[in-house]
């Protein structure tokens, strides 16, 4: 029985057009193939000349996105090159430092390949400006000290002798006591104690000299030491790092670059030369290159397995070699067309859209299988060759076109999403599917004509028919329907839970890109070890400021955040106080020290008696004080005097003269060192190693702040918390963590939105295909009033309307209206959507039961399963609509749906052998998804249709009078349906290509 809206009872413009095209192609196969060959050659040439590849992850993001515009601004100012981290591990600090020096020297010798080499912090030019790191108060103190010693600086070294210095200390203490200034008293006593300890130690051992002069440049010495060469090592000294950027960008689809290749050679050669150390590489460029290289190897291996597996399935399904070969040739031509189409529309492939070939292989071959199965079925019913091709196009052509359009629209809906990578994949895959459908009606009939036109039906293969399954469904449709629906509900429900009154998915989304990498990849393991050893991440957020003052303020705010481990910026390398506050003081100090005289060849003669008297006076003066320091100084002075008194005069002169010489040399050395760090010219970023200042200050004067996380932000929850915190300080912050977070959220939302949009569009297309023009207009126009009213009420309430909700509302109302005007056709539309909806529900349940999560690699399962499921549903329901008499799924439909699903499962399942975990997860979820849709399409849906057919066959008004076999049918299509009705099997006829 047929419904009123079956294709054969309504307008047959599309079937007639497809039949006409097929008749022309089969009558002129050589001419057709020549035209197709020229068009294919043109597509290949255009592709080879103009198609490019974009392997950067940032190419997947819409350039209009605010967060991506901030990233591009950062890249424009500071360069696109991310740091490569060379990790050196050895038994001790010396071995690690030697390896770092060797690697650094090799990198610097190849400047065309490597830039911004940071193996040591080497800023010698900053040493001469060390005073600028002191506070104004400390500088004033130094200036006062120099003011008191001005005569000594200018050459009167007699004033710095032992006796003279002792008298100065005595006068300083007397004056401080008279002024009643405890602070100055303590200062004087500390200096006396320093002199007493120094002299006492020297008298005991002339090889042990300690300077008696106060260290007025101690902070400067510290700064100078920090500014000298320093390796980047862990506290243990057994792990060190060299940071470098690659100058040569990646070439081609593999993501490899000359810089990375050479860098691996340098690391390998150095590790071989210095056998004690191990050298590895990590960093974002290395992680991405390793991922791309591994995935390319895996895809190549999977393609070989897929090709062989699909060929084997077609061989078993069609029981011969010839017809599977024709289908694969047609698919190859369509793929070349798709490449040309991609070149003309998009112009490039990215790391997501490069998978379009796998998608088209999985979906495009379906059209050829459906076409070939029906053609062979008709030939086995002794139809004439050219007539069988025309009837094939008339019977399954509508289903192929409907499936192609709905599947194409499912992908094209991705263009409405925010994620550019998904949108481009949607355009390429959507257009490619339509090209596969065109090739099915042009290339395939021409190839079949050249192959089969002189063959008798007895020499053609007999495809798989699914006889047992068809009989089971025909005999027990109610039982099969109930059992399968119950199973789908029970299993599918495992994927969801009820929490706080809302239904939530148990299947989670894993955004950690490291979990997609192959196990055992060196760069991933090094990154994890590096994080553990240093509590540092390779990922960091980037904040850009306009001035050093703003950089310091913002850096301090970042450092106060709980989730921030450390902050790096150029301001931390520069003096804390601006030159306007310190420059005059430093100029004064520099001017005084510029007069520093050399030490005299002979030092002032020493007078032991005078020295003893002065030290005795100091002893008595200190003895009058009661502080601990005074007690210590008094004790040391007493001991010193006792030692001197035991010596003969010549010995006293000799030892005290030696001490005085060492004392004057120490003062001169201290003043000289102070002079060396008193350069008054301001410290600038260019005083530092270019590898440092280029990373933190742009040529335009922008200042960069790197904010490192305390936790591992490859995981989504720590990443989101970290981003929330750093955005509280700088809402415009960017960097790889923000890019990863926003891109992962965009790709997740884009796939889900694309699936929703596609479901809405596919439903509307199916309604347009099923309902006649008059009711269709009402069906499409009536819901606009409801949607418009809902939108108006939302606006009136001050709420923003959700586009997805409005589209869903429009679709639901359209279906309800369509049910009123044409119940049977609308019911068929809903049943067509049963495989993707019920199959998807079943798929999520299996995911939950097997602990499979969605991730950025396998989210493509959503539009793919919708396309594959709708494709199966369209062919099964079209088969139902074409059937006259009691319904039973036709052998060609069973054969085609089974083969298309199995070939898709084989194609995607071949990825399970991959080492790249992203490809493994992609293959696994697609095998489960396609298998779920296959189960619903072959078992549940035919059983439901069989029940519907039995119900409608009991109504007398819908019975069709039996046709007279002696009268020819009025329509060519009736020949097909009558033949199907009168035959259950094709007959087992031998094939010449078995």
What are these regions (language model features)?
Residues 1-55, 69-73, 248-254, 258-511, ...:
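Membrane-embedded transmembrane helical bundles of large multi-pass transporters/channels
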Residues 84-89, 239-249, 502-514, 535-541, ...:
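Short, hydrophobic beta-strand segments
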Residues 67, 514-528, 681-688, 748:
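A general structural motif
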Residues 93-175, 559-613:
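Solvent-exposed, membrane-proximal periplasmic/extracellular interface segments of envelope transport
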Residues 111-127, 275-283, 481, 565-571, ...:
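Short beta-strand elements
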Residues 83, 477-601:
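Juxtamembrane segments of multi-pass membrane proteins
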Residues 51-136, 510-516, 527-563:
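Juxtamembrane extramembrane loops of integral membrane proteins
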């Amino acid at each position: 029985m047929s419904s009123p809206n079956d294709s054969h009872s309504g307008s047959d413009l599309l079937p007639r057009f497809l039949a006409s095209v097929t008749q022309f192609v089969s009558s002129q196969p050589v001419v057709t193939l020549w035209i197709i060959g020229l068009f294919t050659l043109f597509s290949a040439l255009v592709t080879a000349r103009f198609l490019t590849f974009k392997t950067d992850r940032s190419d997947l993001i819409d350039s209009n996105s605010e967060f991506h515009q901030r990233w591009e601004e950062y890249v424009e100012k500071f360069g696109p090159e991310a740091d490569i981290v060379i990790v050196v591990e050895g038994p001790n600090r010396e071995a690690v430092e030697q390896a770092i020096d060797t690697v650094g020297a090799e990198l610097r010798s190849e400047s065309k390949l490597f830039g911004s080499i940071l193996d040591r912090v080497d800023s010698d030019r900053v040493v001469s400006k060390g005073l600028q790191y002191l506070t104004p108060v400390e500088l004033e103190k130094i200036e006062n000290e120099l003011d008191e010693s001005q005569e000594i600086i200018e050459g009167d070294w007699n004033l710095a002798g032992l006796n003279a210095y002792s008298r100065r200390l005595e006068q300083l203490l007397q004056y401080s006591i008279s002024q009643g200034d405890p602070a100055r008293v303590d200062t004087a006593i500390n200096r006396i104690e320093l002199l007493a300890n120094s002299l006492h130690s020297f008298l005991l051992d002339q090889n042990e000299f300690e300077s008696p002069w106060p260290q007025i440049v101690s902070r400067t010495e510290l700064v100078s030491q920090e500014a000298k060469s320093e390796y980047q090592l862990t506290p243990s000294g057994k792990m060190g790092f060299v940071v470098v950027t690659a100058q040569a960008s990646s070439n081609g689809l593999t993501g490899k670059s000359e810089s990375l290749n050479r860098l691996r050679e340098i690391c390998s050669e150095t590790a071989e030369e210095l056998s004690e150390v191990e050298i590895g590489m990590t960093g974002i460029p290395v992680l991405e290159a390793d991922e791309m290289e591994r995935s390319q190897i895996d895809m190549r291996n999977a393609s070989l397995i897929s090709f062989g597996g699909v060929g084997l399935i077609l061989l078993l399904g069609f029981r011969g070699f010839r017809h599977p070969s024709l289908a694969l040739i047609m698919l190859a031509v369509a793929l070349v067309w798709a490449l040309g189409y991609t070149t003309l529309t998009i112009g490039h492939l990215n790391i997501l859209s490069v998978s379009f070939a796998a998608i088209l292989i999985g979906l495009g071959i379906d059209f050829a299988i459906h076409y070939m199965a029906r053609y062979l079925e008709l030939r086995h019913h002794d139809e004439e060759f050219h007539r069988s091709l025309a009837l094939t196009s008339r019977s399954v052509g509508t289903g192929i076109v409907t499936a192609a359009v709905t599947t194409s629209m499912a992908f094209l809906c991705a263009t409405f999403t925010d994620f550019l990578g998904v949108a481009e994949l949607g355009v390429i895959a959507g257009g490619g599917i339509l090209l596969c459908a065109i090739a099915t009606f042009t290339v395939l009939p021409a190839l079949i004509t050249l192959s089969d036109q002189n063959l008798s039906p007895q020499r053609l293969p007999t495809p798989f028919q699914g006889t047992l399954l068809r009989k089971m469904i025909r005999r027990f449709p109610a039982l099969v329907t109930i059992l399968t629906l119950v199973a789908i509900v029970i299993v599918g429900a495992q994927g969801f839970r009820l929490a706080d009154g809302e239904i939530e998915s148990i299947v989670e989304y894993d955004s950690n890109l490291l979990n997609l990498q192959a196990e055992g990849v060196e760069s991933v393991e090094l990154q994890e070890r590096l994080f553990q050893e240093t509590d540092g991440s390779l990922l960091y957020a980037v904040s850009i400021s306009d001035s050093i003052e703003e950089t310091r303020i913002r850096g301090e705010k970042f450092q106060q955040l709980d989730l921030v481990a450390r902050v790096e910026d150029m301001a931390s390398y520069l003096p804390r106080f601006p030159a306007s506050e310190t420059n005059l003081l430093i100029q004064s100090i520099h001017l005084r020290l510029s007069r520093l005289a050399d030490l005299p060849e002979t030092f002032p003669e020493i007078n032991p008696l005078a020295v003893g008297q002065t030290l005795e006076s100091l002893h008595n003066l200190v003895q009058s004080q009661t502080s601990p320091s005074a007690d210590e100084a008094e004790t040391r002075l007493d001991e010193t005097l006792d030692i001197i008194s035991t010596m003969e005069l010549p010995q006293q002169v000799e030892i005290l003269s030696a001490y005085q010489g060492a004392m004057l040399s120490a003062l001169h050395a201290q003043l000289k060192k102070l002079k060396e760090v008193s350069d008054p010219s301001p410290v600038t970023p260019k005083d530092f190693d270019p590898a440092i200042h280029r990373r933190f200050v742009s040529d335009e004067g922008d200042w960069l702040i790197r904010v490192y996380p305390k936790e591992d932000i490859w995981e989504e929850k720590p990443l989101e918390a970290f981003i929330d915190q750093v955005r509280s300080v700088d809402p415009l912050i960017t960097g790889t963590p923000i890019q990863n977070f926003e891109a992962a959220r965009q790709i997740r939302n884009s796939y889900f939105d694309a699936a929703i949009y596609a479901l809405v569009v596919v439903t509307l297309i199916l309604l347009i295909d099923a309902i006649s023009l008059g009711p269709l207009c009402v069906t499409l126009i009536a819901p606009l009033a409801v949607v418009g009213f809902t939108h108006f009420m939302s606006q009136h309430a001050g709420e923003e309307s959700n586009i997805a909700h409005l589209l869903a509302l429009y679709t639901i109302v359209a279906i309800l209206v369509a049910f009123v005007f044409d119940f049977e056709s609308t019911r068929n539309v809903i049943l067509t959507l049963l495989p993707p909806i019920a199959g998807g529900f079943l798929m999520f349940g299996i995911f939950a039961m097997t602990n499979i999560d969605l991730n950025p690699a396998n989210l493509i399962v959503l539009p793919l399963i919708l396309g594959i499921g709708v494709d199966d549903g369209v062919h099964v329901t079209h088969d139902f609509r074409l059937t006259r008499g009691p319904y039973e799924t036709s052998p060609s439909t069973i054969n085609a749906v089974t083969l298309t699903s199995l070939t898709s499962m084989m194609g995607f399942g071949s990825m399970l052998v991959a080492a790249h975990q992203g490809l493994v997860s992609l293959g696994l979820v697609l095998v489960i998804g396609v298998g779920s849709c296959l189960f619903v399409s072959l078992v549940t849906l035919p059983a439901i249709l069989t029940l519907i057919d039995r119900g409608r066959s009991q109504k007398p008004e819908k019975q069709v009078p039996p046709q007279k076999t002696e009268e020819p049918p009025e329509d060519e299509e009736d020949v097909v349906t009558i033949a199907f009705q009168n035959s259950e099997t094709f007959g087992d006829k031998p094939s010449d290509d078995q």
